[in-house]
Amino acid sequence: MKLIVAGGGTGGHLFPGIAVAEEFLSRDPANQVLFVGSERGIEARAIPRLGYQLELISAAGIRGKGSLAKLKGAAMMIYGYAQSRKILHRFQPDLVLGVGGYASLPMVMAARGMEIPRYIHEQNALPGMSNKVLSRVANKVFISLEESAKFFPKDCTLLTGNPLRKQILEMLTQTETENPPSIPPLLKGGSEPCEQRGFNLFIFGGSQGAHALNVALPQAVAQLSPKQQRLIKIIHQTGEADLQQVQAAYQANGLEADVRPFIDDMATAYRQADLIICRAGATTIAEVTALGKACLFVPFPHATDDHQRKNAEALLKKGACEMLVEQEIGGKGLSEAIARLMENRDALKLIGENAAALARLDAARVIVDQMLEGVQPCTET
């Protein structure tokens, strides 16, 4: 059988598609997968490196654009639709999965025109425009968070969770004995080794870091009590741009921290953490719930439709995280939140347990099972 995975643009859209592709290929050595994306999306770089086939089509957004940009975007979508039909004729897929992002729209619509079974997956609590449109022509809508169900046709929406790649799942779910800690001794301001501490704090803002977190965290830790500062062990992924600034900030306050531009072994960093402070992207949420870790989310305020905040709020109402908006992390807001959680290990444990209850480690398997079963298209409205 053949599967097309269409969409991307960001890792949050693309990586679940890769997880589904892995599961689909594992079912039969003869199965084939083709990714379809746009030249400007992360897929243009990531998919070839992973060894998958990739076709690029014309696609662009039109929301929030001026009149000329909207016309150009519409023209690109029409051209992308024509390109998609050619790809479908050439590749002859049995199934098409849209994972969100601009490139998913023309491909899934073309699949509908050619009566090829088509499915979509929504990662966030607040769906993007493409998936809202495509839900009207999809055979099935797979969602990661139940909060997004109200945006889709009830009779063909299934809560599956957010698929994680097998490599990531294996890393996340290994026990400490299977994969002993590899994080080296702490660095004081990134330079001097020191002994282990009693409370592990892990901060990251994605592969590029998050400037607001990078500025706020050293200041927040500096406001903790001397006792709390002696207990805390900090692992802080900054991204390249802020590395030296963050190292200097910890040093200036006499604070111990392991400051790195990037962390390759995220699974170990996750597992060792008592508290994680990070953004609220869909993939991050899937990973931390898979591990049952307590998180303090600081949603990226400029995400489309503020969807990261909606993601965090979905967990917050279930007692599965703490959340501060970016405006609250300056001053004493962040330090008070850290101090409160440091002093209440039972609260941390409960947050982690509630997060673990939301984890769906079989998301990729369920999605592939559903696609292979085949269902009738949703009723168009």
From Swiss-Prot:
Topology within the bilayer: Peripheral membrane protein
Role: Cell wall formation. Catalyzes the transfer of a GlcNAc subunit on undecaprenyl-pyrophosphoryl-MurNAc-pentapeptide (lipid intermediate I) to form undecaprenyl-pyrophosphoryl-MurNAc-(pentapeptide)GlcNAc (lipid intermediate II).
Pfam families according to UniProt: Glyco_tran_28_C, Glyco_transf_28
Protein family according to the UniProt entry: Belongs to the glycosyltransferase 28 family. MurG subfamily.
Domain of life assignment: Bacteria
Gene: murG
Organism (species): Trichlorobacter lovleyi (strain ATCC BAA-1151 / DSM 17278 / SZ) (Geobacter lovleyi)
The protein's name: UDP-N-acetylglucosamine--N-acetylmuramyl-(pentapeptide) pyrophosphoryl-undecaprenol N-acetylglucosamine transferase
Subcellular location: Cell inner membrane
Classification via PANTHER family: GLYCOSYLTRANSFERASE, UDP-N-ACETYLGLUCOSAMINE--N-ACETYLMURAMYL-(PENTAPEPTIDE) PYROPHOSPHORYL-UNDECAPRENOL N-ACETYLGLUCOSAMINE TRANSFERASE 1
Residues bound to UDP-N-acetyl-alpha-D-glucosamine: T10, G11, G12, N124, R165, S207, I263, Q308
Top EC category: transferase
